[in-house]
Swiss-Prot record:
ATP binds at K274. Binds 1 zinc ion per subunit. GO terms for molecular function: ATP binding; cysteine-tRNA ligase activity; zinc ion binding. A motif ('KMSKS' region) lies at residues 271-275. The keyword Cell cycle does not apply. It catalyses: tRNA(Cys) + L-cysteine + ATP = L-cysteinyl-tRNA(Cys) + AMP + diphosphate. It is found in: Cytoplasm. SUPFAM superfamilies: Anticodon-binding domain of a subclass of class I aminoacyl-tRNA synthetases, Nucleotidylyl transferase. This is Cysteine--tRNA ligase.
Amino acid sequence: MLTLYNTMSRKKETFTPLHPGEIRMYVCGPTVYNYIHIGNARSAIAFDTIRRYFEYRGYKVTYVSNFTDVDDKIINAAHKTGEAPLDLAQRFIDAFMEDTTALGIEPATAHPRASQMIPDIIEFVQDLIDKEYAYAVDGDVYYRARKFKHYGELSHQNVDELEEGASQHITQDELAKKEDPIDFALWKAAKPGEISWESPWGKGRPGWHIECSVMSTKLLGDTFDIHGGGQDLEFPHHENEIAQSEAKTDKQFVRYWMHNGFVTIGEDDEKMSKSLGNFITVHDIRKTVDPQVLRFFMAGTQYRMPIRYSETNLKNAANSLNRLKIARENLTYRRRGAETGVDPQITKQLQTLKDRFVTAMDDDINVQNGLTVLFDLAKLLNEYANEETVKSESINDLLNEYDAWLQIFGVVFADQKSLDADIDALVKARDAARAAKDFAKSDQIRDQLAAQGIILEDTPQGTRWRRQ
């Protein structure tokens, strides 16, 4: 039974999709004004892992993740570089796709952009004005937050407390325009030199929150299963999305809210963020760290928990990944000479492990417990590889399940079915030299292979080789 922690209820709930066998989910994507840092990547990796597990469980997943390409940060960055805002946004969208591809993140079913949905956004805002949930002032349009009776429920905050906080963080100009300090912008009047579009309220551009409401409901419907994002988006972004969407449709917006934890760095476990200037971009880290190691490191922590970034933790992830790789290579090698048929004991052990894996992952995607079972499966691969007699169908069953679990964590190892002919020939030549007790030649071949990054392992079943 699959359970997910719902931020709205603050508890784990049994997951029941709106449409049997299908999951529709929306995950807030990046504001594209810079390269993504590993804190941004954590969210993308966490929800890619969740999506992959849903697919492993047999669900058809429609996964939408947006690009915010109209925003104050983009306008400011473009002003500094001299680029047009949408050109700068496109440059960093391309960089995002390159980084996430390297991290083994599957492309979303759709990657909508705010700039491509301006007519839909204007229509959405007008509907809110018509229903008296919004009002226009001097080209700006604001949402009447207090009118929405459920405002504050997602973040579990009292409206009066929100008012006190909002009053301390808005300008005098905003305070003069707004009916209430907690009201927020749906549409912003154009400023000189800024990108803008024509609207019933004059030239302007959309607010951040309205963009996600429009993109998600247009592509997934008025009500969909899961909305995800970082914990920092819970308020005000997701709170405001709910207010806008449910005021317009009079329907529940999202059934399950999922929020991932932060990446921390340094001795004080400070949150990694661009605003604090303590971030490391994926673009830069890829120059020195294998992206698959970074992916495995990130995917190995339950999505709601914080991740501490450190060289030590990366090294541990690399070592764990290598153990998993070696286990696969060991059993793959035994395909040679395997007898046809199935080993009933292996079938039974594999089923037990599958049941344990699903039980672990069904508990709010508990990847730590899931990885424990994955390493137990790796142990079984190694043990079976050392058996004197192995069955071909059992090898295939073990490797197929192993690969399916690895892929949930974004790990794909190169198949060892077709070994390099030259290396194979050298291994056979070394075996012949050993049989002839020509140990000098045997050692010379071992050294030659080692120089190519090939490690040899002498076992009772023959010599195996693997790449470092």
